[in-house]
Structure formats: structure tokens, C-alpha cells
């Protein structure tokens, strides 16, 4: 389930009616711990439509760390206080650039809600970052000094970069970064997190940083995905 209808959303291909129950999620985490797994990520849809269940799972599985990829529009002070209380949940907030570019894909007013969410998270001293889908159109913006300085000022400690994945029959293939843009990104991310001249934020490129983990981490090497139907998949992006 999700409260937005973003253009080009890969998760929308799963449909909008499937959801794992609290009992399903609890069972997955319990079984995962038996296998030695203590780090869990929530994607969506929008995970924060299930705020109560997420906090309940954080409480029960206090020996685990949880991370949610969220559009940020449902973050409020009450939820920040709950995050503070449980202490084992962090967030990555989706952002595509500044207001005009971001709201073009995500909807009018979403950028302002994200900025407000960041202010709340920062004021509560919580750990959060951004999840950025870079395309052929926004790659220069989301790697610019101006943009990075802004999210650092807002309190972001890290940023994920994912290149646009054209999913579905109506996918906008022209948004896929070119070979030259991918090469630019490879070097730019290393500049951003460089010890000399870098930014006060940890930048990660999900695809281009594969060399640090010996290639793709999917298929149970270090990671697998369980979709909203309960199916175990090698990777969230394969469907």
C-alpha cells in the first residue's frame, strides 16, 4: 500500500492490494534471527502506512536493527518520539532533487512535506538519510554541491543513490542514465565521500559500488527480498 502514485515506481508493478500481516512479519524476523540475520529493511509501497506494526516489531525484536525506505510524507512528531523510544529504527527518505523536479514525479507538495519531515527528524536527534533515484534528467542536480549541502544542513547522515530502472510496459526508457552518466556517477560518488574535499555525508551507489562487496549481493549472498505476497526473491529489482 502507498499514499502516493509516483511516475515510474517499480514497486507499483506488484499491485496495491498485497500486504504481509504483522504475524507474517514477526514470523519472518523470528526465523531470520535463527539464521543469524539481525538487520531488516522495509520497502513498499510506503512502509509508514504501517507505523504501529513497525514500532511493535522494533519493540519485540529489540536485538535487531530496522531501516525503512519512505517517501517521508507520514513522518510526524509522534512517530519521531516512538523512533526515539525504541532506538532501533532509521529512515531513508526518497528525494529526486529540488522542488520542481521532485514533485514532477512524486506529486505537488511532496517536496515541502519531505523538508518538514527532515526538520522533525533532525530536531529529535534521529539518524536518517536520503534515497535518491538518479535519472538522465536529474543526475547533475542530485550530485551537485548545492543539493548535497542542503540535505546535510537538513540533518542527513547518508544518501543512497539508485539509478532509474525502467519497469513495466509504459516505462520511460529515456530516463535511464547513459553510459557516460553512469561513469560520471562512479567518480562523483567517490569525490563526495572522499577524505579530502568530500562532504560530511556518506554516499553510496547501489549499483556502482558493487566492487566493494564482490559484485551483486543478491540471491542470499548478503541479501534477499521478501515481497508483499510472501515470496522470497533474489532481489527487489528482478520482477
What does each model-found stretch correspond to?
Residues 103-215, 219, 228-233, 237:
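Radical SAM enzyme [4Fe-4S]-AdoMet core and its adjacent flexible, acidic
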Residues 25-42, 50-162:
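Radical SAM/AdoMet-radical enzyme domain recognition
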Residues 1-8, 38-42, 230:
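N-terminal pre-triad scaffold of radical SAM enzymes
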Residues 1-22, 236:
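Canonical Radical SAM [4Fe-4S] cluster-binding loop centered on the CxxxCxxC motif
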Residues 12-16, 98-101, 166-169:
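A short, flexible beta-alpha/helix-coil linker loop
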